[in-house]
Structures are given as C-alpha cells and as structure tokens.
C-alpha cells in the first residue's frame, strides 16, 4: 500500500496489574512496547499464549488503563491513568470485535446491527441503508429477521462484524474473532472481512495466534515476545492485493514470510 499518515501511536507502553493486599507487585504484562499504525493499514499481531495481546487491545480500546507509556490518536494523546476517565472506544473512534459475538438474543440480525446506531443516536435513513449494504456484502441478505439462535456460528460472527463496521469507526480492533469456528468457516470469514475492509480501508489491528491468518489478512505483522511483552519483530507482508485467502499457501512470498514469523514467535 502507498504511504499514508500515522493514525495511532503506542509509545513505551507498560502494564502491570495492582497487587492484591499484602502481596508483592504483580509482574509486568507489557513493558516498553512501541509501534505505530498508518491510516488505512491492516496490521496483524501474533505472539505466544499469554503474551498480553488481549490486554494490549483492551488498553487501546480504553477498557483498561496503562501503567506507563502513551497512546496518541491522530496526533493527540488519549492516555489516561484514571479508570474513571476511561472512554471506551474513544467516543466511537474505535470499534472492537472480540472472540464472542455478544449478540443480544432478543434482537434480530438487523436489530443487532442497528443497536450501536440506536445507542449513539445516529439511526437514520442513511445509516440504515449502510447497514443493509453491509448485510448484503457478507451474504446475510434474507436473514435480517432471524434471531441469533437461528443462525450458524459463522453467520453470528458476520453479524457481529457488521455491527461494528456499521457506525464507521476509523480504527477497528479485532481480538481473535474467528478462533472458535471451523477451518472452512474461518476462511470464508477472512474473505468477508477483506471484502468489507476494501470498501472503506479503515485501520484494523487484528490479533491472532494463526500465522497463516496474519499473512493472509495483513499489510504488516508484528510479533510480540513472551511476558513482559514487547515488539520482538516486524514483518511486511510482500503479497499484493487483492488476495484470495483460499489460495494464500500458493502465493509467492507466503512460505518465506511464514517461516520468518514462525521463527520469531518461537
């Protein structure tokens, strides 16, 4: 992708949880962690289990505070040490897709997608049309009035993805969103995600354990070390877009990139 402005910067981030009464301070989960993300970049992050990947995303989403360091969004610091001052999602500037779809069981597919817009007071003819467009883009047309228990796991994941994209946040955090589905469904969800990303090229930070997934989706992959987590390596993904994720193993540059990342993860 071409050069673009830095949208999000993480500067010497550190996180340790408060000690329990009468105990020693907890070890650092994250320490001296720094990276930046460009506007419109698809950044993937891989690392061993327990490397603090979810903790990092929670801090970026302002669900949790950092112990030290700074987060800069679009040139302005959004760092806070006070849990009472947290603003989850930076006032709608950050979307967050987790492993769980968290769909409301009493709302239909369409109503789940529209929920965030309702809460934000942004539900109107234009945003409703955007919701319908995204629903069609991921193959959910005809299932708008189905309830979560009537949907397959993959369809629930697509609904959760569209629910986040519909309010058009400039940054989207994704914490292993496809980890719980079978391989075939996962490949289709990856293809759906790339299709949606290509519609608007929002900045995505995507955490995964799967090196193949990191390569198939990302412009660049960061490797986290074991705790205390830092950036152990950075790998540009030399595979041009558009990509067919079903053919990723056969694409030039995949095998060499996979081996480099695997060596750094280990």
Report each predicted region and the residues it spans.
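ABC ATPase NBD coupling module
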Residues: 24, 78-95, 107, 119, ...
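The feature captures the beta-strand-to-loop junction immediately N-terminal to the Walker
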Residues: 46-48
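Helix-to-loop junction immediately C-terminal to a conserved catalytic motif
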Residues: 61
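Conserved ABC ATPase "signature" region
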Residues: 76-77, 114, 118, 125-143, ...
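Short coil-to-helix segment of the ABC ATPase nucleotide-binding domain corresponding to the Q-loop/switch region
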Residues: 107-115
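Conserved signature/switch motifs of ABC ATPase nucleotide-binding domains
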Residues: 146-149, 167
